[in-house]
Design a protein with these regions (language model features):
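Glycan-recognition and catalytic cores of secretory/periplasmic carbohydrate-active enzymes
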Residues: 1-381
Length: 381
């Protein structure tokens, strides 16, 4: 049953239409409002109203049907296709789809090495934001994976050119700006800070996603070249990332947060689901550099990714959930919020616990990380 669902997900991804190699980031349906027992709810009109669209976490529109193509999202999806091809099954369609995208990606790389942030939905031309950002790092990882599988030099050349741009323009000044820095849950500065430092502290508004993508790309560059400069920059970037990991248990946090990750230097979340994504990379650096602290931090991040789950194994968390949602019972086991303290406030009565669950940014992501680490590194204590 699980394999069937996984294969359905693969088929869905492959069904996304490509336009000159580029492709949409989501499928959605038309919605409408219904009233049940006096309360109003948003409900889908059904799959017969489906449309292709893109993430609305962008500077231009909240409407996913009108949102532009996001290079980062496409590179991430294509990278996952390559990992499936490499690690699970040699489905040639995955490689072909990713390579069609890669050729389009090479065609829009700037002379300075960066890739654009977004492409206009109609003209397919680069838009006005994040055209020299560390989002480029994820495309580096994708291109290097494709080079590993095809041995085509053009992918490697483009990847190293992009990586060097990030090394010279982003890392020295901590310009960790990506879509989530300004156009997701914390929009502070989106009107006047993009590309600029805050005068008060001489820092950019920063998001640790960019740090992760860059540390990951630098590790892949090192693996291909054995050039220690890439490893040194990677460790430097990883250390910045680890500054956003909780290394203590504050008394004003009412669930376990040790090992969990925050998000921005201008937002409130703790125990964010990204810790499940980060854990493998941290452990990889730890094993490569023979640094037990990194390995410990990586496994702590993995464990933290399960902390928000409503289940008997998390008695402290379970108690908090039941305070804020008294109707929770055994049929709700497995429910997990993407983070803790999303609104910037917590209290003993359950404030900060949240109200929704996202499978691939919560319980599913945590389970995936556990299984990947189990496969790669063996039994997890």
């Amino acid at each position: 049953e699980l394999l069937a669902k996984a294969n359905l997900t693969k088929e869905l991804a492959l069904s996304f239409p490509q336009r000159n190699g580029f492709f949409y980031g989501l499928i959605g349906t038309e919605m409408h409002e219904v009233e049940i027992d006096g309360k109003k709810y948003n409900r889908s009109k059904g799959w017969n109203t489906y449309y292709w669209g893109n993430s609305n976490r962008n500077p231009y529109t909240w409407n996913p049907k009108e949102s532009p193509y996001h290079i980062l999202d496409m590179s991430w999806t294509a990278l996952l296709m390559l990992r499936w091809y490499d690690e699970l099954e040699k489905d040639a369609r995955l490689l072909a789809y990713a390579e069609d995208y890669a050729m389009a990606l090479l065609g829009i790389q700037y002379e300075n090495g960066f890739f654009p942030g977004w492409l206009d939905l109609k003209t397919m031309q680069p838009m006005n934001h994040l055209n020299a950002s560390p989002e480029t790092s994820l495309s580096v990882t994708f291109l290097l994976k494709l080079y590993e599988l095809t041995h085509k030099e053009e992918y490697k050349r483009a990847a190293f050119k992009a990586m060097n741009a990030v090394i010279h323009e982003i890392i020295p000044v901590g310009k960790w700006e990506d879509f989530e820095t300004y156009w997701s849950c914390s929009r502070y500065g989106s009107d006047n800070l993009v590309g600029k430092k805050v005068l008060r502290n001489n820092m950019h508004k920063q998001n640790n996603f960019s740090m992760f993508w860059t540390a990951e790309a630098l590790l892949e560059c090192y693996r291909l070249t054995s050039n220690k400069e890439y490893l040194d920059y990677g460790q430097r970037t990883l250390d910045e990332l680890l500054m956003t990991q909780a290394s203590w248990q504050p008394p004003y946090m009412y669930v376990n947060v040790l090992g969990g990750f925050g998000v921005l230097n201008a937002d409130g979340e703790w125990n964010d689901s990204r810790e499940s994504l980060f854990s493998e990379l941290i452990i990889q650096y730890g094993k490569l550099l023979d640094k037990p602290e990194y390995i410990e931090r990586g496994y702590a991040a993995l464990k933290a990714s399960f902390v928000m789950m409503y289940c008997t194994e998390n008695p402290q968390t379970k108690q908090q959930w039941e305070k804020v949602h008294p109707f929770f019972a055994s049929e709700d086991y497995g429910f997990i919020m993407e983070n803790y303290g999303h609104g910037g406030r917590t209290n003993p009565a359950g404030e900060g616990m949240g109200e929704f669950t996202i499978y691939d940014w919560g319980n599913g992501a945590a389970a995936e990380a556990y299984n990947r680490l189990l496969d790669k590194f063996g039994k997890i204590e």
